[in-house]
């Protein structure tokens, strides 16, 4: 099924405005999303009319609609793990950790605790979307999603070969309770992704990192991943 192009463009507009740190003009927005000013104007007008954007002089910033939706959702806006809980986990396993969630078809980090290389820290701090199959956290997310959701994501965002290759990993990931990085993205680190559940519902993943010493498996990282799974199970929310 084809998505209406206006929806991803509207999402792109909101992200650009959110990241800008200052009001963006209509021409700025059109340039960022690589679209004609005329069609961008229509989308921006619709977003402003619904409260997602507001005018500030000749520019636009985020409006109050997102805030009111979060208020309406109430408890649903609570993160799967608070920063304090993530700090506690970091102290327990003595390894850097980060919390990430599924946003559309990407893994997005919410926050992290612990020392990591600057380029990796920037991905977490700036909430940079990461492809699911390129990260241990993303593969853990895929492995523990309901089968129909996983199949839909792989059909749209993976090649047939990638989908088949990942299919051979799923049982092993689910059996051990975490996914390990193959080093395709975090070359300085070895990384494990551990699922976070609320009842039977997959909420997020915790990503655990350790320095890459060699290309051989890291018993210390796997031990930290297992301890993370135990810690999460003891604090699982209903």
PLM feature segments, named:
Residues 16, 32, 81-92, 96-98, ...:
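Amphipathic alpha-helical regulatory segments at dimerization interfaces
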Residues 88, 97-98, 155-160, 176-183:
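Short helix-to-loop capping/linker segments positioned immediately adjacent to catalytic or ligand/cofactor-binding
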Residues 61-154:
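Amphipathic alpha-helical effector-binding/dimerization core
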Residues 162-232:
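Extended hydrophobic
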Residues 9, 39, 65, 81, ...:
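Charged catalytic carboxylate motif
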Residues 1-76, 230-234:
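N-terminal helix-turn-helix
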Residues 18, 142, 146, 226-237:
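Short amphipathic alpha-helical signal-transduction/dimerization elements
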């Amino acid at each position: 099924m084809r998505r209406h192009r206006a929806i991803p463009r509207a999402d792109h507009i909101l992200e650009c405005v959110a990241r800008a740190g200052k009001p963006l003009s209509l021409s700025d927005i059109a340039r960022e999303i690589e679209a004609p000013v005329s069609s961008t104007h229509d989308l921006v007008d619709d977003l402003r009319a619904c409260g997602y954007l507001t005018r500030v002089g000749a520019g636009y910033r985020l409006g109050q609609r997102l805030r009111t939706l979060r208020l309406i959702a109430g408890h649903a806006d609570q993160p799967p793990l608070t920063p304090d809980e993530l700090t506690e986990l970091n102290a327990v396993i003595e390894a850097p950790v980060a919390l990430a969630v599924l946003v559309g078809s990407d893994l997005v980090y919410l926050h992290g605790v612990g020392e990591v290389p600057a380029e990796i820290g920037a991905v977490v701090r700036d909430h940079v979307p990461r492809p699911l199959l390129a990260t241990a956290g993303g593969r853990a997310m895929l492995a523990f999603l309901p089968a129909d959701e996983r199949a839909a994501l792989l059909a749209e965002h993976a090649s047939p070969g990638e989908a088949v290759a990942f299919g051979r990993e799923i049982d092993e990931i689910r059996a051990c309770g975490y996914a390990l990085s193959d080093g395709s993205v975090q070359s300085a680190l070895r990384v494990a992704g551990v699922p976070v559940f609320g009842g039977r519902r997959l909420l997020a993943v915790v990503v655990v990192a350790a320095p890459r010493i060699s290309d051989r498996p890291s018993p210390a990282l796997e031990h930290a991943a297992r301890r993370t799974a135990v810690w999460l199970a003891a604090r699982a929310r209903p």
